[in-house]
Amino acid sequence: MATINTNNTNNEGMYAKIKTTKGDILIQLEYEKTPLTVANFIGLAEGKIKNNKKAIGEPYYNGLKFHRVIADFMIQGGCPDGNGMGGPGYQFPDEIHPDLKHSGPGILSMANAGPGTNGSQFFITHKETPWLDGKHTVFGSVVEGQDVVNAIAQDDLINEVIIEKNGEKANNFDAAKIFTSELEKLKKEAEIKAENAK
């Protein structure tokens, strides 16, 4: 069972510690480059975003399984139904950032069923997957525990997701508020784009 060296979370930033049946995975979250996606992940992890699967205050990811594991590709989790078909009861737009690519092992990215269908499902890569660039929102990367990612098998559990914030910017990141404001901002941008396309 792998444990996390907490020195890695002493650096400024925002981290998610995913505690699994195989050990811990520590991920640095890209909250400045993908605020909506990170706010969604944190809000669900901490039970602060309204969804149709769990009550407010109840951590969304705790007890869910990695329902899809493909060797030499990725592990996928975050489906409340355990079959890849479930979500939180809402969807939000992609948040593709040019600096964030599926550039190697340990990339945290949103699973989706096409553009604008993000919900709660995410995946972590085993290797570089450039064909996913521009199609899936990258929002973090593993800083410790890639061996755990590689050891995860189908139906292994996410026991708990713990969010750790270091530094003023990270500590001021209010996931529930940011999720709402970023979602509104992206909707307005899409409306303007659609209007200009007429």
Go through the PLM ranges and name each one:
Residues M1-K198:
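Cyclophilin-like peptidyl-prolyl cis-trans isomerases
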